[in-house]
């Protein structure tokens, strides 16, 4: 969902280069220098307003997290939230998920998260889905060997497409859940804003974890 651009967003992003990067290409291969200490690097593509990535950074101080968001106002909202926390293991990027190879070196990322991505339901838009084969090829490059992807969605169509696309690509599934919130996997689940909304309506949340051979 597109959010109307707010005038305060750009000045806020510009005022906090220590936390949000506007030109991620300058740190390609050097992301560990942005953190207090060198640790495994996890990336969320499409962080939205930041609830998930901030929650993960709080729960896992032993991991360095990066959240990426293309919409500047949405990214600025996430930045506002992150500024309220003291998280030396969190960095944010205002950037495009299609440019990941320009942002990260091969094998620089240990794990990726795709949460409630745009399902692009029309068949002619299949190539825009973040689990289309061309995106998977990019993820395979920036991820370490056997690097994992975690995906959550409320959209069964996108979930089925992702399962098929990943299977056809030769990925291995470590877990598939058709009702996350009523499974043991939910015990340590960190929710997104969308996830809370959909779950409150009783909609099942689908999740998968897959890795490259």
UniProtKB/Swiss-Prot annotation:
Catalytic residue positions: 118
Highest taxon listed in the record's lineage: Bacteria
Enzyme class, broadest EC rank: transferase
Record: residues binding S-adenosyl-L-methionine: 44, 69, 96, 118
Residue numbers binding substrate: 122, 154, 192-195
Catalytic activity: guanosine(46) in tRNA + S-adenosyl-L-methionine = N(7)-methylguanosine(46) in tRNA + S-adenosyl-L-homocysteine
InterPro entries xrefs: SAM-dependent_MTases_sf (IPR029063), tRNA_(Gua-N-7)_MeTrfase_Trmb (IPR003358), tRNA_methyltr_TrmB_bact (IPR055361)
Pfam families: Methyltransf_4 (PF02390)
Keywords on record: Methyltransferase, S-adenosyl-L-methionine, Transferase, tRNA processing
GO cellular component labels: tRNA methyltransferase complex
Pathway membership: tRNA modification; N(7)-methylguanine-tRNA biosynthesis
EC number: 2.1.1.33
Keyword tRNA processing: yes
Gene3D superfamilies from the UniProt entry: Vaccinia Virus protein VP39
Any GO MF annotation of the entry: tRNA (guanine(46)-N7)-methyltransferase activity
Function of the molecule: Catalyzes the formation of N(7)-methylguanine at position 46 (m7G46) in tRNA.
NCBIfam families attached to this UniProt entry: PRK00121.2-2, tRNA (guanosine(46)-N7)-methyltransferase TrmB
PANTHER family: 3-DEOXY-D-MANNO-OCTULOSONIC-ACID TRANSFERASE/TRNA GUANINE-N 7 - -METHYLTRANSFERASE, PENTACOTRIPEPTIDE-REPEAT REGION OF PRORP DOMAIN-CONTAINING PROTEIN
Homology family: Belongs to the class I-like SAM-binding methyltransferase superfamily. TrmB family.
HAMAP family: tRNA_methyltr_TrmB (MF_01057)
Name this polypeptide is given: tRNA (guanine-N(7)-)-methyltransferase
Organism: Limosilactobacillus reuteri (strain DSM 20016)
Gene name in the database record: trmB
């Amino acid at each position: 969902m597109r959010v109307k651009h707010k005038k305060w967003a750009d000045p806020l992003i510009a005022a906090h280069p220590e936390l949000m990067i506007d030109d991620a290409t300058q740190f390609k291969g050097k992301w560990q220098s942005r953190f207090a200490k060198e640790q495994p690097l996890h990336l969320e593509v499409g962080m939205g307003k930041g609830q998930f990535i901030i929650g993960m950074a709080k729960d896992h101080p032993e991991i360095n997290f990066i959240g990426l968001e293309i919409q500047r106002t949405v990214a600025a909202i996430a930045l506002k939230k992150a500024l309220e926390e003291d998280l030396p293991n969190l960095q944010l990027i205002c950037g495009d998920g299609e440019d990941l190879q320009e942002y990260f070196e091969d094998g620089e990322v240990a794990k990726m998260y795709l949460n409630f991505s745009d399902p692009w339901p029309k068949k002619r838009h299949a190539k825009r889905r973040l689990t289309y084969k061309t995106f998977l090829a990019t993820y395979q490059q920036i991820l370490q060997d056997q690097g994992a992807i975690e995906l959550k969605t409320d959209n069964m169509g996108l979930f089925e497409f992702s399962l098929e696309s990943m299977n056809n690509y030769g990925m291995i599934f470590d877990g598939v859940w058709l009702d996350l919130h009523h499974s043991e996997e939910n015990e340590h689940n960190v929710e997104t804003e969308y996830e809370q909304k959909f779950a409150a309506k009783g909609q099942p949340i689908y999740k998968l974890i897959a890795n490259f051979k």
